[in-house]
From Swiss-Prot:
This is Pyridoxal kinase. Belongs to the pyridoxine kinase family. Pathway: Cofactor metabolism; pyridoxal 5'-phosphate salvage; pyridoxal 5'-phosphate from pyridoxal: step 1/1; Cofactor metabolism; pyridoxal 5'-phosphate salvage; pyridoxine 5'-phosphate from pyridoxine: step 1/1; Cofactor metabolism; pyridoxal 5'-phosphate salvage; pyridoxamine 5'-phosphate from pyridoxamine: step 1/1. GO terms for cellular component: cytosol. Its main location: cytoplasm. Pyridoxal binds at S12, T47. Its EC number is 2.7.1.35. Na(+) binds at D113, T148, T186. It catalyses: pyridoxal + ATP = pyridoxal 5'-phosphate + ADP + H(+); pyridoxamine + ATP = pyridoxamine 5'-phosphate + ADP + H(+); pyridoxine + ATP = pyridoxine 5'-phosphate + ADP + H(+). It comes from the Eukaryota.
């Protein structure tokens, strides 16, 4: 990579395992980025374990950290990456910081994973307070350049339901009009052309031509479903999409193929290791299902393409 590319990543931190900043920093560093991490929480482990302990950063503490960077004139970034946030005032402070950074650097790219909820058995539910939704809709998404919602989050943000691929792209057009040039719906319950064993993801990238007109590239990807429930995959996805869109800014197809293929390598390695540790016929524990990130370094750096994207 030519020159230094620096990312401010505001996400959660765990002592053990890989979620939030722990899932984002390693792949970004492997791919050549400098990463400055603000830990929105510091927990012993993710909350899928039986027990966890830790601390939560307040909006005032976030402001103090940023003011420290500013006082030393080192608040200069090429990218901002944000993920799970539970607190409205904290999210508001993130908005203020990103606005200021964008005023300093008009080329700064803000990558936002608008973590709000998901669908289980066809029913969607939010796992953050509902008062975060208007903040995402009115302030966060209009500032973002790249967003990575799942289907339920895309529906929440747009106020529209998705029952087909056509409706999904109509929702993505609504999201484009709100602000972001790149929208990737990371998972959906839409039927895949490859059958019920596959999960469908969709991407849309709006590009401006020199004459001022816009052209939109749309893609579809099908990934084989995996059995265990992993934690941190969304954080890993957003970080790698940041990296690969930086390296392929006008080719969402290639950026998504590299991102999703690297994800598949990490997940398959994690499944193999977890099953071996758990033993024959035993269900792996949350600790055994932690993403095998370090062991997947070469796959993250140069992924063999195992998932092809279809340009639509």
């Amino acid at each position: 990579m030519e020159g230094e590319c620096r990312v401010l990543s505001i996400q959660s931190h765990v002592v053990r395992g890989y979620v939030g900043n722990r899932a984002a920093m390693f792949p970004l560093q492997v791919l050549g980025f400098e990463v400055d991490a603000v830990n929105s929480v510091q927990f012993s482990n993710h909350t899928g374990y039986a027990h966890w302990k830790g601390q939560v950063l307040t909006s005032q503490e976030l402001h103090a950290l940023y003011e420290g960077l500013k006082a030393n004139n080192v608040n200069k970034y090429d990218y901002v990456l944000t993920g799970y946030t539970r607190d409205k005032s904290f999210l508001g402070m993130v908005v203020d910081i990103v606005q200021e950074l964008k005023q300093q650097n008009s080329r700064l790219v803000y990558v936002c994973d608008p973590v709000m909820g998901d669908k289980w058995n066809g029913e969607g539910s939010m796992y953050v307070p509902q008062d975060l939704l208007p903040v995402y809709r009115e302030k966060v998404v209009p500032m973002a350049d790249i967003i990575t919602p799942n289907q339920f989050e895309a529906e929440l943000l747009s106020g529209r339901k998705i029952h087909s691929q056509e409706e999904a792209f109509a929702v993505m057009d609504v999201l484009h009009r709100m602000g972001p040039d790149t929208v990737v719906i990371t998972s959906s319950d839409l039927p895949s052309p490859k059958g019920s064993d596959y999960l469908m993801a969709l991407g849309s990238q709006r590009m401006r031509k020199p004459d001022g007109s816009t052209v939109t590239q749309r893609i579809r990807m099908e990934m084989r479903k995996v059995d265990p429930v992993f934690v941190g995959t969304g954080d890993l996805f957003a970080a790698m999409l940041l990296a690969w869109t930086h390296k392929h800014p006008d080719n969402l197809k290639v950026a998504c193929e590299k991102t999703v293929s690297a994800m598949q390598h990490v997940l398959q390695r994690t499944i193999r290791c977890a099953k071996a540790e758990a033993g024959e016929g035993q269900k792996p524990s949350p600790a055994q299902l932690e993403l095998r990130m370090v062991q997947s370094r070469k796959d993250i750096e140069d992924p063999e393409i195992v998932v092809q994207a279809t340009v639509l």
